[in-house]
Swiss-Prot record:
The lineage of its organism: Eukaryota, Metazoa, Chordata, Craniata, Vertebrata. The gene is Csnk2a2. GO terms for biological process: apoptotic process; double-strand break repair; negative regulation of proteasomal ubiquitin-dependent protein catabolic process; regulation of cell cycle; regulation of chromosome separation; spermatogenesis; Wnt signaling pathway. Highly expressed in brain, testis and mature epididymal spermatozoa. Weakly expressed in kidney, liver, lung, spleen and thymus (at protein level). This is Casein kinase II subunit alpha'. Heterotetramer composed of two catalytic subunits (alpha chain and/or alpha' chain) and two regulatory subunits (beta chains). The tetramer can exist as a combination of 2 alpha/2 beta, 2 alpha'/2 beta or 1 alpha/1 alpha'/2 beta subunits. Also part of a CK2-SPT16-SSRP1 complex composed of SSRP1, SUPT16H, CSNK2A1, CSNK2A2 and CSNK2B, which forms following UV irradiation. Interacts with RNPS1. Interacts with CSNK2A2IP (via C-terminus). Interacts with SIRT6; preventing CSNK2A2 localization to the nucleus. Interacts with HIRIP3.
């Protein structure tokens, strides 16, 4: 019989929720106040997800453009969790702002109202980003992650679809907190979170005692896809194949080292499909089309994010201190940074 997996705890912000009152993290006890959806006139559908339909809308009381996320029938507990987390994070750096919680007067269907972001579809946007743009937006995303982690919250679904970018205004917002959860040390979490291409190895090997570092893996996948112009970077056909794709880059010996450290037993199905792979050098992914986006600092940062061992990954704060971001930090520390950032030139930041 396989024994129990070894424990693990976050390297940072581990006790944040224990130091807060129960009211802060006990979302099941939370009673959201629901206003009337009649204040909002739906304009057009922006998209649909597994759990919701999203619309651009107008607040008829003040003519403000907003986004209305109408929630599909789902457990009350999940809705309470999302609302509580959004309320706790309100005003946080680069976190989408929850404006209102409303219900349709007839159907009683709950909906969340958010600030509107004039988003550019990432498939188009990622094709035109400069080296400096990538550094800039990754830094802005790290601000959002460090903020939510410092508040005791893991996002658990970091991916391009959930990162809204208004490229004109150089504005980034981390959205969709529907899978987010409060971090408590030694708690075992559901591994059926995140989207396949952005799932950390811990999820793929069924290791439940994960933490904020899961979000750092997903951010690493985004960084890799941006600098190498390969979207997604790890392109698995299913959850099993996803780990195989990762192992082909990070190596199988390294994977077994990770499993051994945490006493993780691998699903026997992997015996047939994993094979043996040596660790690849990040330089192998450079070609003529992406060379202008890759630098030694970019590869060094990537290497420190895409680690099997979740405890070895950089934290959001550590990542923000990496030399890759020096040009961004330098620009943001200048007076009138608002104006200079529009140049998006690496030269301007040196």
């Amino acid at each position: 019989m396989p024994g129990p997996a070894a424990g693990s705890r976050a390297r940072v912000y581990a006790e944040v929720n224990s130091l807060r009152s129960r009211e802060y993290w006990d979302y099941e006890a939370h009673v959201p106040s629901w206003g009337n959806q009649d204040d909002y006139q739906l304009v057009r559908k922006l998209g649909r997800g597994k759990y919701s339909e999203v619309f651009e809308a107008i607040n008829i009381t003040n003519n403000e453009r907003v986004v209305v996320k109408i929630l599909k029938p789902v457990k009350k507990k999940k809705i309470k969790r999302e609302v509580k987390i959004l309320e706790n994070l309100r005003g946080g750096t680069n976190i989408i702002k929850l404006i209102d919680t409303v219900k349709d007067p007839v159907s009683k269907t709950p909906a969340l109202v958010f600030e509107y972001i004039n988003n550019t579809d990432f498939k188009q946007l990622y094709q035109i980003l400069t080296d400096f743009d990538i550094r800039f937006y990754m830094y802005e995303l790290l601000k959002a992650l460090d903020y939510c982690h410092s508040k005791g919250i893991m996002h658990r679904d970091v991916k391009p679809h959930n990162v809204m970018i208004d490229h004109q205004q150089k504005k980034l917002r981390l959205i969709d907190w529907g899978l987010a959860e409060f971090y408590h040390p030694a708690q075992e979490y559901n591994v059926r979170v995140a989207s396949r291409y952005f799932k950390g190895p811990e999820l793929l090997v069924d290791y439940q005692m994960y933490d904020y570092s899961l979000d750092m893996w997903s951010l690493g996948c985004m960084l890799a896809s941006m600098i190498f112009r390969k979207e997604p970077f790890f392109h698995g056909q299913d959850n099993y194949d996803q780990l195989v794709r990762i192992a082909k880059v990070l190596g199988t010996d390294e994977l077994y080292g990770y499993l051994k450290k945490y006493h993780i037993d691998l699903d026997p199905h992997f015996n047939d499909i994993l094979g043996q792979h040596s660790r690849k050098r990040w330089e192998n992914f450079i070609h003529s089309e992406n060379r202008h986006l890759v630098s030694p600092e970019a590869l060094d940062l990537l290497d420190k994010l895409l680690r099997y061992d979740h405890q070895q990954r950089l934290t959001a704060k550590e990542a923000m201190e990496h030399p890759y971001f020096y040009p961004v930090v330098k620009e943001q520390s200048q007076p009138c940074a608002e104006n200079t950032v529009l140049s998006s030139g690496l030269t301007a930041a040196r």
